[in-house]
Amino acid sequence: MRRLYIIPKRDELEKSLEIVNKYNAYFEYDDFFWPDVISNDEKIDEIINTYLALNRDTSNDILHGAFFDITIHSYDKEIVAISDKRIRKSIKIAQRLGVKKLVFHTNIIPNFYSKYYINRTK
């Protein structure tokens, strides 16, 4: 059975809820993989509380875990440590939200990084 997922916009949650209800869809959270969010426990709490306040079943929703620069196979133990920390934090966020599906990307997403890296090297 195919399912429809939408990425909820926190500044337009009513509209996101309308779509979910109208099309029997689910949320696909992409708030937490950003480094400035996953590094900030207060921001994480704020976002989680916003979603939990909707009082909806989240068990079929999907969460995108941290993936920026995650390298668990690095030769550098410090990189492995921060990668492990980000992965475990993503798991805890999923648990708090009641989400049973957690996606970790491979850190290689074509066209996602290119502009960022090019701008950083200027």
Task: Name each region found by the language model.
Residues 73-122:
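Active-site acidic/histidine proton-transfer and metal-coordination neighborhood
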Residues 1-89, 95:
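N-terminal pre-domain/capping segments
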